[in-house]
Amino acid sequence: KPHFRNMIKQRGGMFAKGFLFGTQFTAYLQDELWLTMARHAVTQAQRIQTAAVQKGYRLFAVSPTNQVFPILTKTQIQSLQTDFTFELTAPVDESRDAVRFVTSWATPDEAVEALLQTL
């Protein structure tokens, strides 16, 4: 039908993207929910970053955010890939790569502990 999409919108069957995103942001900003969620993510990442340095790992970049960039050997990377999800960021040399771990509001302490025990 011609103008079918417009008819759906006019009758409330399809929300505008701006309305939906605005509703999400209203919820995030209420009672500083976004800050609480971000604080948890950054705290978890800092735990990983601090432990990695204490264990002797070099960092590709020091990050104050919810991302951690340790440099690992290719063997370590292969071993970690069986139990953890992360991104290969950049090759450092023939035997080592920088990887990126990202934490979120939903990253549990148990997941961080498991990673730290494996590193």
Describe every region a protein language model picked out:
Residues 1-67:
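Active-site C-terminal subdomain of aminotransferase-like
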Residues 46-47, 51-119:
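Conserved C-terminal alpha-helix-loop-beta "cap" of PLP-dependent enzymes
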